[in-house]
Amino acid sequence: MKPIVIEARNIVTRLGENLIHDSISCTIRENEIYALLGGSGSGKSTFLREMIMLETPQSGSIHIFGKDIADLSLTEAQELRKQWGVLFQSGALYSSLTVGENITLLYKEYTDLPPALIHELVKLKIDLVGLPTHAIHLYPSQLSGGMIKRAALARALALDPKLLFLDEPTSGLDPLSSRQFDALIQQLRDLLGLTVVMVTHDLDTIHHTVDRFALLGEKRVIAQGTLKEVLAINHPIVDYFFQKESHGIQG
Ligand SMILES: Nc1ncnc2c1ncn2[C@@H]1O[C@H](COP(=O)(O)OP(=O)(O)OP(=O)(O)O)[C@@H](O)[C@H]1O
Ligand SMILES: [Mg+2]
């Protein structure tokens, strides 16, 4: 078995009065495309935000690359952050900057590379995610939804991370663009040896792109594993997602 990249154990999260996670655990291994699936409000984004150190659970532990993320010095935390890229749900590009400038910003913030080299790297990343070369000069408002996702992905990949976090990468995209984006994620995983963690509602993504996933519900992990393993579990939430919804998709 491949080495473990992320190990979350017994995570308990309270936000205000709300108990969001009541002891959730999951194990994500190198080179996997791993998804967090669950109904709206089941705490998927919150869990993702805890993994990337934007929020802190009340108890439990998260180890990434073997390090307990609750137990890092500032320098260690900064070093660890450089090893992952994040694609937020909205894309979160700066609207006043071009695609090229959006990506450049990251290199300026985290590296001392000379401008000419940064420019070459930006062009490479834009090419890597399948955007046309001229996209470097475009503003986010001039891009389609699919192109915005790709531009945000190019930025997430700027520092050559080994780990990629995606929050609802195909939401808002039409079915064809969604499948193309899924295919891109798989290609990049293979090409760059990435480990990918994504929050998704997209059952096509679960069926065709994801290796394993955790189904969140009732504040817990209802099921975890490959699609086949999860489907073998007898639980109303599993039925809800995979019988009702697949029935709906087939019309
Ligand atoms: N700052 C906060 N204070 C209190 N409650 C919050 C806060 N942020 C989120 N919540 C609540 O936490 C729960 C989980 O939110 P989260 O965004 O993680 O869900 P989600 O599974 O990502 O949902 P969606 O699929 O709609 O994106 C929700 O009930 C939400 O209302
Ligand atoms: Mg969410």
What is the role of each PLM region?
Residues 52:
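Helix-to-loop junction immediately C-terminal to a conserved catalytic motif
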Residues 139-143, 147:
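Conserved ABC ATPase signature
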Residues 160:
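Conserved catalytic motifs of ABC-family nucleotide-binding domains
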Residues 164-167:
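Catalytic Walker B motif of ABC-type/P-loop ATPase nucleotide-binding domains
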Residues 116-134:
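Conserved ABC ATPase "signature" region
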